[in-house]
Amino acid sequence: MKRALQIVGLAGVLALLVPLALVSAGQAQETHVSREGGAWAQEITGSLAAVKNLRVKVDMGSVVVRGGQQPGINYVVHTHFGDSSEQDARRQFEQYKVTAYVKGDTAWIVGDWQGGRRPRRFSGEFSVVVPRDMALLKLETEGGNVDASGVAGRVEAESGGGSMKLDDIGGGANAETGGGSIDVGTVGGELNLHTGGGSIEVRHANGKVVAETGGGSVEIQSGAQGAIIETGGGSVEVRHCNGKVKVSTGGGSVDLSDIGGPAELETGGGNIHLTSAKGHVHAETGGGGIELYGVPSARAETGGGGITVKLVNTGGERNDSDLETGAGDITVYIAADVAINVRASVDMGNGHRITSDFSDIHISSEGDKWGPKSLTADGKLNGGGPTVKVHTSSGDIYFKRASH
């Protein structure tokens, strides 16, 4: 019986020590209330010991995290309440509880409104300064903006609808918002970006980029390991990206510059333009024009626009090419060292033509000037190779020598 009481007593002591350990991991908070313009402001400051990870979880307000050289974690919480008496403002401030503690290898900063329905005039901002060598930042707010920079590890950020800004991140990053924009500077790892409707911009990513928006535009200036981009209707621009690039937009334009691999490009109705790609390109639009320059092979299809393709030897894989439009002209530029077989046709040849700078491409027609006439062309260049099929229902076809 005595031993049982000793065990119960020890358990009770441990139960008391655990919450004390959590509280003692951080210093006491300091609170100051003052008048700012037409509103009351409360400032809460505190610090925590340096650990590997930081989690910030708040039900309102923006979150700003900066990496620096200091040894610990310092935080400042600013809350504001609209025009009222000081007594009323202090009563509202007391409803918003901010707790900070360390548990294991993770520091926690939590903001929780505990007063029922929150007044519309109440707002807040969490500012945190951390050591640069943090392994993980996990930041979550139900509606405010998130801004993080200057850390060597990984960042995971989530907002119910605010904007996201990430820069100088050594590891990878995930960012998700219900509708705000996402702006990314430099990230050392992979990127997963999702917004319900805002725009997405990435300046440089050393890992693969996955970017998805319900309707905003997407711009990637530099990517090192490929990209998957999807937007419900906005435009897409990629300036430089190694690896495979896959783009889908419900109706916006697609503009790619220097792609270091294959590309799959699709738009519901916008134009597609590509400056160069080292791999096979598949481009499809419901009705816009397609321009693909500096590609080894391509499949291009449009419901009604024109197609221009420049075939070159890039050192990448060369496949058969298939170029087709419902009612536009098709122009194919061919570099001097490209070996291909050519097959071309125009369904409604009256008033249209096939022309070629190459004597090895032979052009013929069927029908007469008074009836339906079709045009065809075939031949081999440099001994033949992958087949290039070119077809338009109603338009002209041109085979031209590429100058460079």
List PLM regions with ranges:
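Intrinsically disordered, low-complexity terminal regions
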Residues: 1-404
